[in-house]
């Protein structure tokens, strides 16, 4: 968890990971920020939903800043040791188009935020952000907790890799983002993968109902 990222902290530094009020807030803050300002965007430890998402957002913000907020900077604090999706493409694009805008930093997990001073801290720096987009570490939703499918201390749900049946509770199947990569392999948490998992799972469930080995 990130120190200070409670309700007040989230109000100042929204994740804006799902479309809605927070994405509108982030846009409005970017529009209102004066030229020469500093935007800070954090990337959580993987795995998380939509691996290229934070880097796509960084590219869009950088493009906006370059066109409309001259002299502004975007500091990308990546918790990971490198860009974890399409890294070569993003780095090439950033170097070519936004080298004067993007300051990309690896191994820079956010450990603390101070909403009163708009400060975002890593183990190396304290950065004052005119606009802050802090995306915290992700886990499976509260729904799986209500069903008891996520073991304590784990972020995702372990499943059988052939049937997607929970290894915690029999006859319950989990697909998509909620599955644990240590049991399904290093597949991205994407819509395409979830769709594919659903088809495999449906076939497995039919086989199980009919007493056929999967």
Predicted regions and their residues:
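Sec/Tat-exported extracytoplasmic proteins
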Residues: 33-37, 98, 205, 209
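A Rossmann-like FAD-binding core segment of flavoenzymes
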Residues: 63-158, 212-213
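FAD-site-proximal beta/loop scaffold in flavoenzymes
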Residues: 4-35, 117, 127-196
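Active-site substrate-recognition segment that forms the wall
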Residues: 46-69, 157, 165-186, 197, ...
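Rossmann-like NAD(P)H-binding beta-loop-alpha module
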Residues: 22-72, 82
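Conserved active-site and cofactor/substrate-binding residues in soluble primary-metabolism enzymes
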Residues: 21, 52, 56, 85, ...
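Internal hydrophobic alpha-helix adjacent to the cofactor/substrate pocket in enzyme cavities
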Residues: 192-214
